[in-house]
């Protein structure tokens, strides 16, 4: 993996131990409804994520196997969206997350965040190649379906609800530009 840009802000308020992460988990994951991990290695990945150490979170999450993939995928998506400077690298990262999410969906059909993070990654990928091109490749339907499944699995998944609304708004906006 190429060198990652470090999180540029003070993160001292987000330094957690396993115990303090568990205590704050519901507040930190209100939007994505991610369940608190059972595996200590995955807990460490989430500790790194919340501290803004996205590279470490990705590395630890991937090393933990499928149980750590939501932490890794979220870390990679947030990193790509906010810190990665290369558009080409962003697209590569989003594609990698999308592929990993598809495998995770097949292995665990009840993992709402495997569907949500797929939609996030492919939605951002679509924006990078242009929404019109993405729709032509069928990504629009796949993103919408993934968000719909995430919401069926976890109706209180606020992030998926917001993303589905944004998806509809962007598709309508792009379609109206074409006319």
Regions found by a protein language model. Name each.
Residues 1-115, 121-128, 132-154:
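N-terminal alpha-helical interaction modules that lie
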Residues 156-161, 175:
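Short, structured loop/turn "capping" segments at alpha-beta junctions
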């Amino acid at each position: 993996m190429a060198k990652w840009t470090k999180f540029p802000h003070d993160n001292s308020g987000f330094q957690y131990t396993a115990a303090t992460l568990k205590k704050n988990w519901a507040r930190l994951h209100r939007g994505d409804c991610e369940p608190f991990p059972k595996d200590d290695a995955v807990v460490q990945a989430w500790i790194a994520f919340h501290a803004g150490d996205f590279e470490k979170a990705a590395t630890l999450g991937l090393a933990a196997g499928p149980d750590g993939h939501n932490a890794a995928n979220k870390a990679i998506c947030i990193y790509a969206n906010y810190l990665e400077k290369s558009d080409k690298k962003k697209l590569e990262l989003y594609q990698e997350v999308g592929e990993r999410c598809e495998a995770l969906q097949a292995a665990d059909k009840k993992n709402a965040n495997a569907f949500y993070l797929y939609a996030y990654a492919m939605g951002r990928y679509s924006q990078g190649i242009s929404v019109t091109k993405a729709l032509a490749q069928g990504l629009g339907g796949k993103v919408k379906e993934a968000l719909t499944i995430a919401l069926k699995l976890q109706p209180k998944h606020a992030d998926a609800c917001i993303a589905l609304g944004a998806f509809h708004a962007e598709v309508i906006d792009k379609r109206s530009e074409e006319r």
